[in-house]
C-alpha cells in the first residue's frame, strides 16, 4: 500500500528504490501493457464525433447510433479498486475525445481534496471560451421559409410595418439551488465554485439583461431566492412578476415576468396539478397562465395568452404528464377564449420533460393523440424500452377531474330544486363548471389550438439534434416555446382547426447548440452559463 500511495502522489522515487518492494518495477511495466489494448479500443471508438451520452429519441439523426456505454464496449474490465472511488465510475463520466487525447495513458488520481481544500486537478482545469449563439431570422413568403443567420442581414420583407406589435419571449429553467444540491450526482463534471448560488445568480441575471426579452417564463424559481433577489432585481429592470410556487413542501415554482412598457395585466390564473381527491394527480407540479394586453395607443389589439409550466420529470409516468398537460390546456382554453367564440394568440412555454417526436410532443403540435395501447413510459420519449410497463388506461383521468377528452372544462347540467307557491317541486337545469356526465369511452385526445414550435430540434445541414439541457447523465431537448401561428405557418405544422384573432409570426429565434458544442465548455452549468438548461428566446409579430 505504501508503494501505491507513492504512485498516487506522483513521486518519481519512493521506498521501492531501496529494495523493500523488489517486484514493483516489474508490476509497473505489466500495468502499462495491460492498459494499452483497452486504451486503443477506447480511443478508436471515441473518434466517432457523434457518440453522445443522451438517449435517442424518435426521428433521431440516423448516422449517429448513440449507444449505451458499458464495459463490454471498451474492454475496461481491469479496474484497481484502490485507484477509483465510486464518484468516478465510468457510467457517470462524459467521455470526450478532446479530453481523452490530452490525458496520459495511466491516470492514477485519488480525486481526494487536500488539507487546503483545493479541488482535484481534473476539476481545476478551466474550459476557456464562450460559445456564441446567433439570431436566426425567419420570414415566411408564400409558405416558403427563408432563414438568415446573424444580426445584420435581415430580410427586407421582415422590416417593421405600421399595423403590427412586436415582442420577444424567453423561456428559461434557471435550476433551483435546492434541486441542484439534492441531485449533485448530475453535476460531477462541474467545478464546485460555479455551482454556488452566489456565483450563479449574477450570471443568470446578466443573461436576462443581455437578451432583454419582453416576457420571461422561468422554471425552477426557488421561493426564497425569488423573494429576496430574483423579483427585486427583475422589478428594477422594468418587469412585473407573477409567481406560482409548487404545492406540498417543494421549494420552487414557475414565474412569468413582463415589461411594464409593453403590456398591462388582465388576469392571473395559477394551475395546480395536485388533486387530493384523485390518486393519479399526487404530484406537486404547477402551471401559470397570464392574459396580457399589448400597449398600443393607436390601434386595437387582441390580448395575448402566455402560459408557463414545468411538467413531471418521471419518465415512467406518462399518464400523469398527459393529465397535467390536459389541465394546462383546459386553463389556456378558458383564459384565451374571447366573447365572439374565437381565441386570442397563445404562447406556451416551459420544461415539458418530453423529447421531440414523442407522443406528448406530437399531441401538442398536431392537436390529437390516439393513446390506445400506448405504454406509459413511452409517452415522453425518455424511456427506450417498454418492457414491464403497463398500458395507458382508457380514459386516462377520472371523470371527476372536470376536463373532457378535448382538454376543456366540462359543463354539467345539474338539477336544481325550487319550491313553487303551491309547495310543489320542480326540476330546473342550471349550468355549472363542475363535472360531469361520463362520455363514451374513447382513446382519442384533442385540443383546440394550432401550435407550432419555435425550434426545429435538428440542425438542417447535419441532422444533429439541438440540445436544451446538458449535465452528467443526459443532453437532450425538453424545453419548448409553442405559439399559435398565423395561417401560413400552420400549413407547415398541421394542427387542430380553431378560430384565431390574428396569429403570431415568428420573426427570429436564438440558435441552440449541440451536445458537442456544450462539452467544449465543460457542459452545463459552467463559468458563463449558470443553469443546466439553455435559455430559449424568440421574437414574434402580431399583425393588427
Swiss-Prot record:
Which residues lie in coiled coils?
A: none
Named from the GO MF annotations, one term is: mRNA 3'-UTR binding
Give any Pfam family that matches: Exo_endo_phos
Which SUPFAM superfamilies would you find in this protein's record? DNase I-like
A Gene Ontology biological process annotation? 3'-UTR-mediated mRNA stabilization
Cellular component (GO) terms are: Cajal body; cytoplasm; mitochondrial matrix; mitochondrion
Per the record, the similarity remark reads: Belongs to the CCR4/nocturin family.
User: Can you name this protein?
Assistant: Protein angel homolog 2
Organism of this sequence: Homo sapiens (Human)
Amino acid at each position: 500500500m505504501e508503494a501505491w500511495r507513492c504512485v498516487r502522489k506522483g513521486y518519481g522515487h519512493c521506498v521501492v528504490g531501496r529494495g523493500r518492494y523488489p517486484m514493483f518495477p516489474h508490476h509497473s511495466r505489466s500495468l502499462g501493457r495491460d492498459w494499452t489494448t483497452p486504451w486503443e479500443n477506447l480511443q478508436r471508438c471515441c473518434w466517432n464525433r457523434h457518440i453522445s451520452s443522451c438517449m435517442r429519441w424518435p426521428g433521431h439523426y440516423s448516422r449517429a447510433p448513440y449507444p449505451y456505454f458499458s464495459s463490454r464496449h471498451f474492454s475496461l474490465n481491469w479496474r484497481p479498486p484502490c485507484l477509483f472511488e465510486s464518484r468516478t465510475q465510468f457510467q457517470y463520466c462524459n467521455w470526450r475525445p478532446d479530453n481523452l487525447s490530452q490525458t496520459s495513458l495511466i491516470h492514477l488520481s485519488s480525486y481526494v481534496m487536500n488539507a487546503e481544500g483545493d479541488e482535484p486537478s481534473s476539476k481545476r482545469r478551466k474550459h476557456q471560451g464562450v460559445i456564441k449563439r446567433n439570431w436566426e431570422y425567419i420570414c415566411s413568403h408564400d409558405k416558403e421559409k427563408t432563414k438568415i443567420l446573424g444580426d445584420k442581414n435581415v430580410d427586407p420583407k421582415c422590416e417593421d410595418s405600421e399595423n403590427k406589435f412586436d415582442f420577444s419571449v424567453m423561456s428559461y429553467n434557471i435550476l433551483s439551488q435546492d434541486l441542484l444540491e439534492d441531485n449533485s450526482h448530475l453535476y460531477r463534471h462541474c467545478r464546485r465554485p460555479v455551482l454556488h448560488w452566489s456565483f450563479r445568480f449574477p450570471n443568470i441575471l446578466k443573461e436576462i439583461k443581455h437578451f432583454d426579452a419582453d416576457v420571461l417564463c422561468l422554471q425552477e424559481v426557488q421561493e426564497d431566492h425569488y423573494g429576496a433577489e430574483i423579483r427585486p432585481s427583475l422589478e428594477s429592470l422594468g418587469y412585473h412578476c407573477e409567481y406560482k410556487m409548487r404545492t406540498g413542501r417543494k421549494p420552487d415554482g414557475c414565474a412569468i415576468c413582463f415589461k411594464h412598457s409593453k403590456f398591462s395585466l388582465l388576469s392571473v390564473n395559477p394551475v395546480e396539478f395536485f388533486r387530493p381527491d384523485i390518486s393519479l394527480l399526487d404530484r406537486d407540479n404547477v402551471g401559470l397562465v397570464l392574459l396580457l394586453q399589448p400597449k398600443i395607443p393607436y390601434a386595437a389589439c387582441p390580448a395575448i395568452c402566455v402560459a408557463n409550466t414545468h411538467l413531471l420529470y418521471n419518465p415512467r409516468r406518462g399518464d400523469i404528464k398527459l393529465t397535467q398537460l390536459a389541465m394546462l390546456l383546459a386553463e389556456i382554453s378558458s383564459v384565451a377564449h374571447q366573447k365572439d367564440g374565437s381565441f386570442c394568440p397563445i404562447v406556451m412555454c416551459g420544461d415539458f420533460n418530453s423529447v421531440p417526436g414523442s407522443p406528448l410532443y406530437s399531441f401538442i403540435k398536431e392537436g390529437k393523440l390516439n393513446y390506445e395501447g400506448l405504454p406509459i413510459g413511452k409517452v415522453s420519449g425518455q424511456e427506450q424500452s417498454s418492457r414491464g410497463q403497463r398500458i395507458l388506461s382508457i380514459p386516462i383521468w377520472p371523470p371527476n377531474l372536470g376536463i373532457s377528452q378535448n382538454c376543456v372544462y366540462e359543463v354539467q347540467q345539474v338539477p336544481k330544486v325550487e319550491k313553487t307557491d303551491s309547495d310543489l317541486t320542480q326540476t330546473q337545469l342550471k349550468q355549472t363548471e363542475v363535472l360531469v356526465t361520463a362520455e363514451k369511452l374513447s382513446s382519442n385526445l384533442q385540443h383546440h389550438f394550432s401550435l407550432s414550435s419555435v425550434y426545429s430540434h435538428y440542425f438542417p445541414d447535419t441532422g444533429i439534434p439541438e440540445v436544451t439541457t446538458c449535465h452528467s447523465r443526459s443532453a437532450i431537448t425538453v424545453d419548448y416555446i409553442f405559439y399559435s401561428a398565423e395561417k401560413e405557418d400552420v400549413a407547415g405544422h398541421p394542427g387542430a382547426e380553431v378560430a384565431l384573432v390574428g396569429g403570431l409570426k415568428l420573426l427570429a429565434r436564438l440558435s441552440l447548440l449541440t451536445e458537442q458544442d456544450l462539452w467544449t465548455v465543460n457542459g452545463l452549468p459552467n463559468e458563463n452559463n449558470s443553469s443546466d438548461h439553455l435559455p430559449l428566446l424568440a421574437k414574434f409579430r402580431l399583425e393588427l
